Amino acid sequence: MDSNTVSSFQVDCFLWHVRKRFADQELGDAPFLDRLRRDQKSLRGRGSTLGLDIETATSAGKQIVERILEEESDEALKMTIASVPVSRYLTDMTLEEMSRDWFMLMPKQKVAGSLCIRMDQAIMDKKIILKANFSVIFGRLETLILLRAFTEEGAIVGEISPLPSLPGHTDEDVKNAIGVLIGGLKWNDNTVRVSEALQRFAWKGSNENGRPPLPSK
């Protein structure tokens, strides 16, 4: 196993632990808590794939971070922070909409790269809106946290989520997954629209690579 893969996992585990302690003091906002929950699932998946114990990895990650901080001057830290591009977190969904359980009468699931697409094929003749929570950098979607399809009544009928065991995806991966979800939902004569934020940052409102723009609400 590559040593960089192991040390990266160890550092991620320790940093998650620090963020969890921060959240336990009721200091985190909704996007912070959302990322914390998602990252926990991702770490569990990575730990299972790598065959590493999370508690042991957290202790090792702490030692790595402490060593780095001992060698880091305040001035170097300021320069590093200033040079890192800042991403924005956009939320179409509330925390309740993101965490709500949902069920499918006729479930269909497909994996596209590192994204899992789920939809209920029993849904027919409905008006559906796609909402997503995601981060944006340089004017483009950076990381999809979660996308869900809602009927006008508020029922969840579809979802696109990152696979915890396969972290990392591009905006092109998200576009392809959205296309699959829309195609599946339209099969039963449903009308599908997307949120304005998703339209703007995932599709950029243009015909990139021959795709028509998605209909927005």
Curated annotation (Swiss-Prot):
One of its GO terms (biological process) is symbiont-mediated suppression of host mRNA processing. The keyword RNA-binding applies. Keywords: Eukaryotic host gene expression shutoff by virus, Host cytoplasm, Host gene expression shutoff by virus, Host mRNA suppression by virus, Host nucleus, Host-virus interaction, Inhibition of host innate immune response by virus, Inhibition of host interferon signaling pathway by virus, Inhibition of host PKR by virus, Inhibition of host pre-mRNA processing by virus, Inhibition of host RIG-I by virus, Inhibition of host RLR pathway by virus, Interferon antiviral system evasion, RNA-binding, Ubl conjugation, Viral immunoevasion. GO terms for cellular component: host cell cytoplasm; host cell nucleus. Residues 180-215 are annotated as: CPSF4-binding. Its main location: host cell. It is found in: Host nucleus; Host cytoplasm. A motif (Nuclear export signal) lies at residues 137-146. Pfam families: Flu_NS1. Upon interferon induction, ISGylated via host HERC5; this results in the impairment of NS1 interaction with RNA targets due to its inability to form homodimers and to interact with host EIF2AK2/PKR. Residues 1-73 are annotated as: RNA-binding and homodimerization. Belongs to the influenza A viruses NS1 family. Homodimer. Interacts with host TRIM25 (via coiled coil); this interaction specifically inhibits TRIM25 multimerization and TRIM25-mediated RIGI CARD ubiquitination. Interacts with human EIF2AK2/PKR, CPSF4, IVNS1ABP and PABPN1. The dsRNA-binding region is required for suppression of RNA silencing. Inhibits post-transcriptional processing of cellular pre-mRNA, by binding and inhibiting two cellular proteins that are required for the 3'-end processing of cellular pre-mRNAs: the 30 kDa cleavage and polyadenylation specificity factor/CPSF4 and the poly(A)-binding protein 2/PABPN1. In turn, unprocessed 3' end pre-mRNAs accumulate in the host nucleus and are no longer exported to the cytoplasm. Cellular protein synthesis is thereby shut off very early after virus infection. This is Non-structural protein 1. It comes from Influenza A virus (strain A/Chicken/Pennsylvania/1370/1983 H5N2).
